[in-house]
Amino acid sequence: PAVPSSIIEPIWYQFEALIPAVTDAHPLGCHRPRVADRIVFEKLVQVLVLGAAYAKIADSTCSSTTLRRRRDEWIRHGVFAALEQICLDAYNKMIGLELETLVVDGCIVKAPCGGEAAGRSPVDRGKQGTKRSLLVDGSGIPIGCVIAGANCHDSPLLAPTLDKLNRFGFDLPEQITVHLDAGYDSGKTRDLLDGLGCDYVISKKGEPLQAGARWVVERTNAWHTRGFRKLQICTEVRTRVIDAFIALANAIIITRRLIREAWTRYRWNTRPARRP
């Protein structure tokens, strides 16, 4: 399997509950039966992890057209975003998110097909690329992500990236420290963080590399690009589809970390024999 069953089973359990019910409106009931949601879900996970084309993943059980149609249907109903939020809430309840320390950084990946979130990449000889502005907590758990063209600077993406904290409502610590690299070293960034009431640690331009607490976001970016081929080379052209795959990838990452951290703290019937 593309993802171990100990991780994908609890994700599917929550995902299945979010899928809206579909009524059979055919008057005679003699049409082709609807492909099971579980089959489509597993195929989409394969697309995400392996990065293969839909036509390569499709087989006699599910066509590529069904994959795309069901994917768009679930996106319209907000299933992927809701799944990501459920995973975050579960991790926060059982382990606890380190929201007192936040880290933001950008990551540029190839986008050979272009699209709504593609631009000329400054690190790939002007070829099409996509930038992900990622927000993580102090332990590297992905909290939110904003996508834009690769030619977009990191600083303008900081405000919409920090807006992802709104998903927690008022359950935020009184004091938050944001760690940023030298790409955010500007007066506008400091004014923005001062207006939000956040402390900040920003690396200085022209000084030697200062990793500090920022290494966790680099690790999470590596989890995205090395663990999910679809995110390493972005072949989707619509922003909402990219966001859906990022949300699914984040759900897998958070669930894996949750099981890993809970493995030494809790006991449950389906607890894996080895710590993931």
Predicted regions and their residues:
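Short alpha-helical elements
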Residues: 1-276
